[in-house]
Amino acid sequence: MMHKTFLGIYTVALGILFGVVAYAQKPDVSKGESAYKPVATLQELMSSIVDPNVDPIWNSVSTISTKEGTIEKKPQTDEEWLALRKHALTLIEVSNLLVIEGRPVAASGANTSSHVTELSPKDIQKAIHANRDGFVKNAHALQDAAKLTLAAIDAKDADELVKAGGKVEHACEQCHSQFWYPNDKRPTASLDIGLKPGNSLYMKMRNS
């Protein structure tokens, strides 16, 4: 009888011991270990998630002049509005992915340069690290602008969608001009003459 009792106590003790060891091996998020494990780089998030979801929003409303006259393009059916809503939601949530710490700007050896004055990935990373709060603020501005597109989509208001799309573009430009090409004066020059983000001439000046 005593042997069985001792065996039972021994078994319980081992169970507690292994439980303590297992608990000790779990990551302690409260001590600074991140609960997130980012895999994609910022460049990959931009090309794989941001661009494919923001372009349909920007292109959803337009005016095309032809020999036959002017063609107004805007979402018409519930299905078209629903498709745009999915893009807006994805854009809202990717803003959260952008601010996860530990995410590199680009993969080793990758070329991020799309403008003459753009910094190297290493220098962009340094700039973000030096002004983390500013980077997060820009990401939140993108999310706020994307929320405006969602509100316009839910209201099925094409005019408001155009305005919100311009604010999304402005948020993107603000972040890139601050961290990717801080020495590039072209966005400022185009704005100084009264052009707004989304204007075709603005984009020509921006990409020239």
Residue ranges and their predicted role:
Residues 1-6:
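Positively charged n-region of N-terminal signal peptides that target proteins for export
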Residues 9-19:
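Bacterial N-terminal signal peptides
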Residues 22-24:
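Boundary at the C-terminal end of the N-terminal hydrophobic targeting segment
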Residues 26-85, 89-92, 96-208:
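Sequence context surrounding c-type heme c attachment/ligation sites in exported
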